[in-house]
């Protein structure tokens, strides 16, 4: 038996500008936080190697600009994603309201094989701030209505729930990657109607 190959997982972080996507990524990968805000231009990514159930996994985490002019980054950017992280700011209701459009944008551009079960994770960021505007129950209700998406309330600044959230992200992404590999290795069998079983094929293979 050949040794198990190294797994590369592509994770995309989406959300409005200023919700803390870059800060969350930097806190998880580099254990750093900066109070200086610098808008992401286009897209950028960081990598991190983690062990999951004795498997070495390399996470390629893509951070995107939230401005509308960058919203359509192209099919190549979205394709091949194993998990999509949707981020909003709990102190800014408008960033929560746009989660639907970000989710739809991803599904349209990425065209996953099984969109109904594609793994999303939602992060309500900046819980360290006092002027909270989006209630936990409201966010949980939205996630439940979207096939029960896992939801975490985070603070990139205080490193609250960041590690826990990304553990769920990598496990869900790994599950998606495994299912895709199995799908590619074992294509769906041809289903014959019971009336077709006794009929010889006159057309031959339709491949």
UniProtKB/Swiss-Prot annotation:
Q: Which GO terms describe its cellular component?
A: autophagosome membrane; cytosol; late endosome; late endosome membrane; lipid droplet; lysosomal membrane; lysosome; melanosome membrane
Residue list for modification Phosphoserine: 72
Instruction: State where it is primarily located.
Output: membrane
Q: Where is the protein localized?
A: Cytoplasmic vesicle, Phagosome membrane; Late endosome membrane; Lysosome membrane; Melanosome membrane
The UniProt record gives the binding positions of Mg(2+) as 22, 40, 63
Question: What are the UniProt keywords, alphabetically?
Answer: Acetylation, Autophagy, Cytoplasmic vesicle, Endosome, GTP-binding, Hydrolase, Isopeptide bond, Lipid degradation, Lipid droplet, Lipid metabolism, Lipoprotein, Lysosome, Magnesium, Membrane, Metal-binding, Methylation, Mitochondrion, Nucleotide-binding, Phosphoprotein, Prenylation, Protein transport, Transport, Ubl conjugation
Biological processes, Gene Ontology terms: early endosome to late endosome transport; endosome to lysosome transport; endosome to plasma membrane protein transport; lipid catabolic process; lipophagy; phagosome acidification; phagosome-lysosome fusion
Task: Give the required cofactors.
Answer: Mg(2+)
* Source organism, top-level taxon: Eukaryota
Which reactions does this protein catalyse?
GTP + H2O = GDP + phosphate + H(+)
Among InterPro entries, the record links this protein to: P-loop_NTPase, Small_GTP-bd, Small_GTPase
Query: Which residues are modified to N-acetylthreonine?
Result: 2
Could you give a GO molecular-function term held by this entry? GTP binding
Top-level EC class: hydrolase
Write down what this protein is called: Ras-related protein Rab-7a
- The scientific name of the source species is Bos taurus
């Amino acid at each position: 038996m050949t040794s198990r190959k190294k797994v590369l997982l592509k994770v995309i972080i989406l959300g409005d500008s200023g919700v803390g996507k870059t800060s969350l990524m930097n806190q998880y990968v580099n254990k750093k936080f900066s109070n200086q805000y610098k808008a992401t231009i286009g897209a950028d990514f960081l990598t991190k190697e983690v062990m999951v159930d004795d498997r070495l996994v390399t996470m390629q985490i893509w951070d995107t600009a939230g401005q509308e002019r960058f919203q359509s980054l192209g099919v190549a950017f979205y394709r091949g994603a194993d998990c999509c992280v949707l981020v909003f700011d709990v102190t800014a209701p408008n960033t929560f309201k746009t989660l639907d459009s970000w989710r739809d944008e991803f599904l349209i551009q990425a065209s996953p094989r099984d969109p109904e079960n594609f793994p999303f994770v939602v992060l309500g960021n900046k819980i360290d701030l006092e002027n909270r505007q989006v209630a936990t129950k409201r966010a949980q209700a939205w996630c439940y209505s979207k096939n029960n998406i896992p939801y975490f309330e985070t603070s990139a600044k205080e490193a609250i729930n960041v590690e826990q959230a990304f553990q769920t992200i990598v496990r869900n992404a790994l599950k998606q990657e495994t299912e895709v590999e199995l799908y590619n290795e074992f294509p769906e069998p041809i289903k014959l109607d019971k009336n077709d079983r006794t009929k010889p094929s006159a057309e031959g293979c339709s491949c």
